[in-house]
Amino acid sequence: MRLAVVVTLLVHCFLVTCSPGDNLDEFIDCTYACEYNRRCPNSQINYIDPETNMFHDIEFFDTPPLYSKLLFWDCISDCDYQCQHIITRWRIDEEEEIYQFHGKWPFLRVLGTQEFFSTIFSIGNFIPHYKGFVKFSRIIREEGDRRRKNSRSILIWNYLYVTVAGMLAWTASSVFHCRDLIITEKLDYFFAGLTVLTGFHAIFARMTSMFLYPKIAQAFTASVAAIFALHILRLYVDWSYTYNMRFNIFFGVLQYILLIMLSCQNYHALQKQKLMGEFKKTAYSSFKRQIFKLCVIPILLVIVTTMAMSLELFDFFSYEWQIDAHALWHLCTIWPSWVLYDFFLEDYAYWGNRQLY
C-alpha cells in the first residue's frame, strides 16, 4: 500500500540524519586509512599518523571492476563500505551494539546489491502491479473492441494509472536498494509521491462517482497532475525531507480514509439490495461473499498494512542473516497489492452490473 511506502521513507530520512556509526572515531580513522593507502582519486586525505591511526597497516582490497563500472562504486565509497564491516565485525567480537551507517544497517554486498533482500522483495512488489496492469489493459482493449467507451472506461483508466505508478515506484525502489546514490534516492522518493497521488485520484473518483461526469473527471485528473508537477518542482528548487514526508503522508492517509468510506458505501448499497429482495434466501451466501469482497477486504487492507508498519517502527537487524525489518516490511507489502487490485476489479464488475450511485 502506498502510505506504507511513505512511512518507510520517513523512517529512512530520520535515520540518515542520526546514524551513530558515522561519528565513531574508529570508523573515521578507518576510512582515512583506506583512502590514504589506496590513493583514492579525489580524496582529501594526504597524510595519516601511524602512531594514532590503528588502521594504518590494514590491507584494504581494491574495488571489483564489475562493481566499479556497472554499479558506480568508486574508491572512496568502497572504502566506506569496507570500513563499515571492519568496524561492525570488531563491535560484534567485543559484544557491542551494531550501529547503522548513513541510515542503513551494514549489509554485505550480494551479487553487487547493497541490500539484497530489500531488492528482491521490491522486485516482488513490482509483480502484482504488473499483473494489475495486464488485467486492466485487457479490459480496456475488450471495451474498445466492443465500442463500449463510456463512463466506466474512465474508472479503468484511473486504475491503470495506479498500476503504472506502482511499477515505476517499485522499479525505483529496487534500483535504490541495489545501489544507494543521490539520483536513485530521489527517484525512489519522487515515484513514492506519484503512487500516493494516483491512488488518491483513483479511489476519490470512484467513491464520488466522478467517472459519471467526464468533464469534471478530466479537470480533477489535470489538477492532480498539476499538484504532482508542482511537488517535483518544489523539491527540485529546495529539497526538503520534511516537506516531502508531510506531502506524501497527507495524501496517503487520505487514501486509507477513502478506502474505508468506499467500504461503507458498498455496504449500504448491498444492504439496500437485500432489503429490496434482490438477494433471495437461496442466494444469501452470495450476499455474504459480496459483503466480504466489497466491504471487508478494503478495511482488512488498511488494518494489515497499518499493523505491518510496526516493522519499521521497531527496527531490527541480523548481521548473520543479512536481513532487517525494512526488508521484511517490503515482503509484507506484496500481498496487499495483489488484494487491492482484486478489490478494484470486483468493485468495477459490481458497479457495471448494478447502477447504484
Swiss-Prot record:
Its main location: endoplasmic reticulum. Residues 23-113, 177-189, 234-248, 315-324 are lumenal. Residues 1-21 form the signal peptide. The chain crosses the membrane at residues 114-134, 156-176, 190-210, 213-233, 249-269, 294-314, 325-345. It comes from the Eukaryota. GO terms for biological process: GPI anchor biosynthetic process; intracellular manganese ion homeostasis. It holds the Pfam family Per1. It is found in: Endoplasmic reticulum membrane. GO terms for molecular function: hydrolase activity, acting on ester bonds. Disulfide bonds: none annotated. One of its GO terms (cellular component) is endoplasmic reticulum. Belongs to the PGAP3/PER1 family. This is Protein PER1. It comes from Saccharomyces cerevisiae (strain ATCC 204508 / S288c).
